C-alpha cells in the first residue's frame, strides 16, 4: 500500500498524516455510507414522511373503494423504515430497542388494518417478528464486532 504525505518536505504536524492513494472498493464505500449517522437519521426521516403520506391518503380515502392499499403500503413501509433507523443507531441493537420496534410494528399494523388495537395482526405476528429477531441479533453482534475493530 503506497501512501503520500499530505505536505512533502514541510516540518509541520500535518506532514505525519498520510493519505492512502488506493481507491476504496465498492464494499468499503457502501459500508462507510451505511454506517454514517446521516444515513441512519435519513432512514428515520423517510419513515416519518411515509407515515405522513399515509395520513394524507387517509383523508382522501373515503372517495376510493380499495383505498386501503393507498393507506397501508406507505404506512407499513414508513414504520419498517423508522424501526430500521432505530435499530441501526449506534451500530448495534439492544434487546430494549428490538422490543420497542416490535411494539411499534405490531401496534401500527393493528391501527392500520381496522383502527383498533386488538392483536388482529396478519403481517407482524409474534412468530414472524421472533424469526426476524434472530437475524437482527446476529447482525447486531456482527456490527458491534466491526465497531470494536475500528
From Swiss-Prot:
The gene is srp. The chain crosses the membrane at residues 41-61, 67-87. It comes from Chlamydia trachomatis serovar D (strain ATCC VR-885 / DSM 19411 / UW-3/Cx). This is Sulfur-rich protein, serovar D. It is a multi-pass membrane protein. Keywords: Membrane, Transmembrane, Transmembrane helix. GO terms for cellular component: outer membrane. It is found in: Membrane. InterPro entries: CRPA.
Amino acid at each position: 500500500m503506497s501512501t503520500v504525505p499530505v505536505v512533502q518536505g514541510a516540518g509541520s504536524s500535518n506532514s505525519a498524516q498520510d493519505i492512502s492513494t488506493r481507491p476504496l472498493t465498492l464494499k468499503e464505500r457502501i459500508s462507510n455510507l451505511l454506517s454514517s449517522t446521516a444515513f441512519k437519521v435519513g432512514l428515520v426521516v423517510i419513515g416519518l414522511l411515509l407515515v405522513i403520506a399515509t395520513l394524507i391518503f387517509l383523508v382522501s380515502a373515503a372517495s376510493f373503494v380499495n383505498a386501503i392499499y393507498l393507506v397501508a403500503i406507505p404506512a407499513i413501509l414508513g414504520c419498517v423504515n423508522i424501526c430500521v433507523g432505530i435499530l441501526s443507531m449506534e451500530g448495534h441493537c439492544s434487546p430494549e430497542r428490538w422490543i420497542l420496534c416490535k411494539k411499534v410494528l405490531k401496534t401500527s399494523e393493528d391501527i392500520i388494518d381496522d383502527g383498533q388495537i386488538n392483536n388482529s395482526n396478519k403481517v407482524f405476528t409474534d412468530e414472524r417478528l421472533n424469526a426476524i429477531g434472530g437475524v437482527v441479533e446476529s447482525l447486531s453482534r456482527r456490527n458491534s464486532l466491526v465497531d470494536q475493530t475500528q
